[in-house]
From Swiss-Prot:
This is Immunoglobulin kappa variable 6D-21. V region of the variable domain of immunoglobulin light chains that participates in the antigen recognition. Immunoglobulins, also known as antibodies, are membrane-bound or secreted glycoproteins produced by B lymphocytes. In the recognition phase of humoral immunity, the membrane-bound immunoglobulins serve as receptors which, upon binding of a specific antigen, trigger the clonal expansion and differentiation of B lymphocytes into immunoglobulins-secreting plasma cells. It comes from Homo sapiens (Human). Residues 69-75 are annotated as: Complementarity-determining-2. Disulfide bonds join 42-107. The gene is IGKV6D-21. Residues 20-42 are annotated as: Framework-1.
Amino acid sequence: MSPSQLIGFLLLWVPASRGEIVLTQSPDFQSVTPKEKVTITCRASQSIGSSLHWYQQKPDQSPKLLIKYASQSISGVPSRFSGSGSGTDFTLTINSLEAEDAAAYYCHQSSSLP
């Protein structure tokens, strides 16, 4: 494996019609090295309270829930993963990144379902 770990981020786009909520993540892609602190942001087009969840997905695997309701930890998920935010602005933080954290990360809202 190369010295730098590649972490991919997905941009989630929901058509903004009839009050539907658009989630925008940044950055789209980031190349980082082990032990770095990584921050991923997710912005909602309107307030969703704390109804924001973070997922990790590795190739050929199903998405894994990392954080629920903005900041609630999930049993079995390493403590280096944490979430914060409310309303429209949310953050996923990975402290002291490890090689096994190379994956796609994305946010999902449950405030308004199709």
